[in-house]
Regions:
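Beta-sandwich/jelly-roll carbohydrate-recognition scaffolds of carbohydrate-active enzymes
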Residues: 1-186, 219
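Short, solvent-exposed loop/turn and secondary-structure capping segments
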Residues: 105-107, 162-169, 200-203, 211-214, ...
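Short acidic (Asp/Glu) and glycine-rich catalytic loops that position anionic groups and cofactors
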Residues: 106, 129-133, 193-194, 228-230, ...
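Inter-helical turn/loop segments and adjacent helix faces that build the functional surface
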Residues: 134-141, 204, 258-263
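Secondary-structure capping and boundary motifs in well-ordered enzyme cores
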Residues: 144-145, 184-193, 239-247
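Short, hydrophobic/aromatic alpha-helical segments in well-folded domains
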Residues: 20-27, 196, 200-201, 213-216, ...
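Helix-terminus loop motifs that line ligand-binding clefts
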Residues: 170-174, 178-179, 209-259, 263, ...
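Alpha-helical support elements that line or immediately flank enzyme active sites
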Residues: 1, 151-164, 187-210, 252-258
Length: 278
């Protein structure tokens, strides 16, 4: 974390058990939008804020005393505290959902994925999901060899990662809101790392997943002011890390193996990218 990373932030107390807000940051993802919704198992007793930035402009809204129990604060260096009455119940369950689209999207994600579920239920669901992914492979070898294999297999399933809300909405490379229709949108394409092995591997073991990744890459090109497939895309941003044209290998391999069928769409994206002097 460094000074100036947060471009703008917001926190709202919607009611005594729901917080929403967002943070726009500048970093490897040049303009990264992160919205959140936080549900609380106990009502807030009282709360307060502090803006650590010295603001020269004193607008009319500064006549309000926002340091305590004011329902909203914005700024670049804001911090907050919340007090709860835990005399009768010492347990406080905090559920957090994220969205790159909006606070409303974060609330939808929260309701869809965590509503009515305990921490133990969510943890068990995560274990079940991971086991269902990893149990497709059964190998022989020493414990160290198995640990190495399954750790590497686990790594292939972390990134690229899903980048959309439960309703299919996502923030595109043009920073507009789009709807993924008929595919799952992905981000985090470190293609100079993954074109050699991960994407060819996914074509063999998870072809549907890699087809969605290819479609996500093509949508990236269609939303690009340069008309380019990803170089190294991250959270709706192109960070331009590494030279070379690695995306073409990913698309060509998926087409050759029959994983991706929209050849005309893919070819148009590949030709467009190849004509950009990068």
């Amino acid at each position: 974390f460094y000074d100036g990373k947060v471009l703008w932030a917001n926190l709202r107390v919607e009611n005594d058990t729901l917080l929403t807000g967002y943070r726009i940051t500048n970093g490897w993802a040049r303009t990264n939008y992160t919205y959140f919704a936080i549900s609380l198992s106990q009502p807030i007793k009282d709360y307060g804020y502090k803006d650590k930035e010295k603001v020269l402009y004193n607008g009319f809204w500064r006549r309000f005393k926002m340091e305590k129990n004011f329902p909203e604060i914005t700024g670049r260096k804001i911090v907050a505290y919340f007090n709860f009455d835990t005399a009768n119940n010492s347990e406080l369950v905090v559920k957090v959902a994220l969205s790159a689209v909006s606070t409303e999207g974060a609330i939808k994600n929260l309701h869809a994925e965590a509503s009515g579920k305990s921490f133990e239920q969510l943890a068990e669901a995560a274990r079940t999901d991971w086991n269902s992914e990893l149990e497709h492979f059964e190998i022989e070898g020493t414990p160290d060899q198995k640990a190495m294999f399954y750790t590497s297999l686990y790594h292939t399933m972390i990134n690229p990662s899903v980048y959309m809300d439960v309703d299919g909405s996502y923030r595109g490379l043009d920073h507009n809101i789009h709807r993924a229709k008929g595919f799952t949108n992905y981000t985090i394409f470190s293609l100079w790392d993954t074109y050699r092995a991960e994407h060819p591997f996914l074509n063999l073991v998870k072809p549907g997943r890699n087809a969605d990744m290819v479609e996500s890459m093509i949508k990236h090109e269609q939303q690009s002011v340069h008309g380019m497939l990803p170089i190294w895309s991250l959270m709706g941003n192109e960070n331009w890390c590494m030279s070379g044209y690695h995306a073409v290998s990913v698309l060509a391999d998926a087409i050759t193996k029959g994983v991706f069928s929209n050849v005309d769409e893919a070819l148009a994206a590949m030709v467009s990218t190849s004509t950009v002097p990068y």
